[in-house]
UniProtKB/Swiss-Prot annotation:
This is GTPase Der. It comes from the Bacteria. Residues 351-435 form the KH-like domain. Belongs to the TRAFAC class TrmE-Era-EngA-EngB-Septin-like GTPase superfamily. EngA (Der) GTPase family. GO terms for biological process: ribosome biogenesis. GTP 2 binds at residues 181-188, 228-232, 293-296.
């Protein structure tokens, strides 16, 4: 399912990051009372009244010609291009400015739904001052206060009201997998090798894949869909006009997938950006397969594969469940095994365990390692049941959810992995108080 994308845009210092944090209930974005502090797009999953969406916080759009200002403008333009709904923010304390008018004209030309929200309306008097913004031609402005939280319900109602059918698109029954990684690790070549034909532009120049490509095919009676991306640019680079891909595009591909192939370059080793990409895949709760490409290039001895695998496990400790496969898209080495792994991981991430079996496991697990004491109070787990797949999600009913420490939660996850085949998929355990 493809999640709707919502972009927060506006001139600097109107409070976009504060609104962003208020919506996602977190302080992911840096909030500082200084224009231009949010330079890169920041994105997170958000939810309102059962509607999930991807929220983007952008740097303020300016007309200044400095390098940083140009980067901010480029980032915002890409966010606007990718968005299904755009929220333009104004600042009631600074009233409407010429810059607001310029941004409104730019947004009007996109032909996309635009919601006008006026921030910093912290008291009744300020809420009546928003009417200057009617002249922007973007409809009724919604007064909000990012710092106090007032008006946020009205804003979120307006946002989800624009989603239409976007949030209700269903998959066609195929196993969908995305191919992600930083530029030039060989994603396009790998897709070509899997498909056995040229379907996308391939060259050694970063970002030569010009648009998103979803390709559906059948292998051994199983239908697959590849969601291909052009990788993730290094932070701080200005995007070229023809470059449509970004961190957001990779996240969108992950969200639309059941499984993600995280592609690493054997010839260059693991870089910091690889870790960022891996984090997106893990956080989305999708299945993950680590594909080490270009294995034909590095000079190797008999231990090099083991050494590289050890490095991966050390650098990506949170992906300890992900299988690793070493391939060469150029020579075709082990490429046929990728689809076998995709099918296996899909079976694992959709696996359901009967409650009676789970509770037998729980009884044995708590016997091996008793539940902990927290401030003199012992955690009591009454029973466990599976409530979802993709990823497999389990609920334990307890006397007090606050007593389930992450270390004991990790112990229970390890017990599940030891007893059932969950290779390639994360596992979630939620605690609920027994009524």
């Amino acid at each position: 399912m493809s999640l709707p994308v919502v972009a927060l845009v506006g001139r600097p210092n109107v409070g976009k990051s504060t609104i962003f944090n208020r919506i996602i209930n977190s302080r992911v974005a840096i909030v500082e009372d200084k224009a231009g502090v949010t330079r890169d797009r920041i994105y997170a999953r958000a939810e309102w009244m059962g509607h999930e969406f991807i929220l983007i916080d952008t740097g303020g759009i300016t007309l200044d010609s400095g390098e940083i200002e140009e980067q901010i403008k480029a980032q915002a333009e890409i966010a606007i291009d990718e968005a299904d709904v755009i929220v333009m923010l104004g600042d009631v304390t600074q009233h409407m400015t010429n810059m607001d008018e310029t941004i409104a004209k730019m947004l009007y030309r996109t032909k996309k739904p635009v919601i006008l929200a006026i921030n910093k309306a912290d008291n009744p008097e300020q809420r009546t001052d928003i009417y200057d913004f009617y002249s922007l031609g973007l409809g009724d402005p919604i007064p909000v206060s990012g710092s106090h939280g007032t008006g946020m319900g009205d804003l979120l109602d307006a946002i989800v009201g624009e989603f239409g059918d976007k949030a209700n698109q269903h998959e066609d029954g195929s196993i969908r997998f995305s191919v992600i990684g930083r530029p030039n690790v060989g994603k396009s070549s790998l897709v070509n090798a899997i498909l056995g034909e040229q379907r996308v532009i391939v060259s050694n120049i970063e970002g030569t894949t010009r648009d998103a490509i979803d390709t559906t095919f059948t292998n051994d009676g199983q239908k697959y869909t590849i969601v291909d991306t052009a990788g993730i640019r290094r932070r701080g680079k200005v995007y070229e006009k023809t470059e449509k891909y970004s961190v957001l595009r990779a996240i969108s591909a992950i969200e639309e997938s059941d499984i993600t192939l995280l592609v690493l370059d054997a010839s260059t080793g693991i870089r910091e950006q690889d870790k960022h990409v891996a984090g997106y895949a893990h956080d989305a709760g999708r299945g993950v397969i680590i594909v080490v490409n270009k294995w034909d290039l590095p000079k190797k001895d008999s231990r090099s594969m083991k050494d590289f695998e050890d490095t991966i496990r050390r650098e990506f400790q949170y992906l300890d469940y992900a299988p690793i496969i070493f391939v060469s898209a150029k020579t075709g080495q082990r490429v046929p095994d990728i689809l076998k792994l995709v099918k296996e991981v899909h079976e694992n991430q959709t696996r359901r365990i009967q409650s009676s079996v789970l509770n037998d496991l729980l009884l044995e697990a708590t016997r091996i390692t008793p539940t902990p004491l927290v401030n003199g109070k012992r955690l009591r787990i009454y029973y466990m049941t599976q409530v979802a797949v993709t990823p497999p999600t389990f609920v334990v009913f307890v006397n007090d959810p606050e007593l389930l420490h992450f270390s004991y939660q990790r112990f229970l996850i390890n017990q599940l992995r030891q007893n059932f085949d969950f290779v390639g998929t994360p596992i979630k355990i939620l605690a609920r108080k027994r009524k």
